[in-house]
């Protein structure tokens, strides 16, 4: 408080000093203006002054007029006041007629005579009384004064019309001081102003106390500013641009062999954070539909850091070459699934091991959830392995499903209780322990799920047949991943889906047949996830426990993958996700690392005839399966 009062007193002293300077400035300005007006008056008087002879001439004329004499007499007033020619003996000029008229006007007064001195510089007027005659009686004469007004000169100047706003006088005076040309400042005043400025600049800044520093560091404004600024600085520092790149093609010629060798799959980025990713397993991946460069990854607990939060969700940015996550979210239970809220670009949804569903908002400065579902029997009580937002911009819901067989529908605005819930049960048996779920493109009612028992089920949310519809058997182990056909083209393949399992296989299915269409058996470990390309009808990807990523193009080959690559260190790959463009693919491993690969154009970009070719491939697969079933049927009787 003492610092504030001292600062306030210092400001008051400066204000008083400024007021004194302004008053002194105003007084000196008034003195200067007064001096200028006096000088102008003196100049006008000096201009009007005339020579002594001219003054005497005017006095003489006035005196003559007062005596009744007119200037029409033969006296000529020249430049040097030379009298008219006279005889050498004469010393005076008389006007008898005028004298007579004067006598007639006044009998007591004698005639008057005007006498001139021979010296033209001195004009002397002698009356008759000086010559021994009677005194002269003076009378009043009328003077007519005529004023001629000066000629009016009209001038025009161009101006810019601007709206006039009423402001306080103090503001106007300050603006005038700034805008109007300043009069020359006296050296003393200038020195005082400079001295004050130097004192202000040299004054040491106020040193904050530890309490004030902590208060600033923990303020919401500082945290928001620091978070935003560090994110921008990291992006700038992480950019790596090759300034020596040769556009003439020499660089490409040197690397032609490397480009052709790695054209199918090439490493793009790696995401790993020492604090939040280390010793954690990547449990789920999802790309943002609003911002295609953002990837959310969920992680389970870190057993070596018991004091850290069990569940973590990190948002990574593909656009900038920064090595730290864009956002860090966490909660008190391991996050088993995560997704971007499709129609809410700021929201991230997570499903936890405890059965809670949590909601994070990147507009909030908090890393903890802004909403969460209750831990009650009305919601989930088992781990939530699947969360998905389905619907349209104006009508959408969050769908969650857990290993207790319960599927819930939620509104993102209110997670206090589900809008709808249903238990998935097949033929009055126990509930299905769901491990994976997928919706066909454009469908919000029908979906497929994989279970811990190795069976696949089709189900629907609404209608008379709500619940489990059909069961598909073929896997010999728990289902780890399931995905419906997502590529939209000339032919509709939405009835197809692929599954992965602990039985080391990937299988292709159709909802029209409860037996697998084809089984891909090229892996030698658990296959943890599988997903179809969003743009290519015959392309899908899968990952296994040996750290291998396989890309299968069924139009090229159904026996071996079209492209394969192993992650360095061969960690188990838990999750795989295509970008929305289908040009990159992300994989997450058991050590908390996420690797992004670029997919070659010859694989990722479909040609116009890919849908027709895939139709023929399916026909061949169905024919081969029919032949195999017929051959198996003939073997049984034998």
Curated annotation (Swiss-Prot):
Major localisation: cytoplasm
Repeat (WD) residue spans along the chain: 277-326, 330-370, 379-420, 429-469, 474-519, 568-607
Subcellular localization: Cytoplasm, Cytoskeleton; Cytoplasm
Keyword annotations: Acetylation, Cytoplasm, Cytoskeleton, Dynein, Microtubule, Motor protein, Phosphoprotein, Repeat, Transport, WD repeat
Effect ascribed to mutating residue 90 to D: Impairs interaction with DCTN1 (mimicks phosphorylated form)
Compositionally biased residues, Basic and acidic residues: 1-13, 20-43, 190-209
Residues recorded with modification Diphosphoserine: 51
Processing after translation: The phosphorylation status of Ser-90 appears to be involved in dynactin-dependent target binding.
Record protein name field: Cytoplasmic dynein 1 intermediate chain 2
Organism listed in the record: Rattus norvegicus
Gene that encodes the chain: Dync1i2
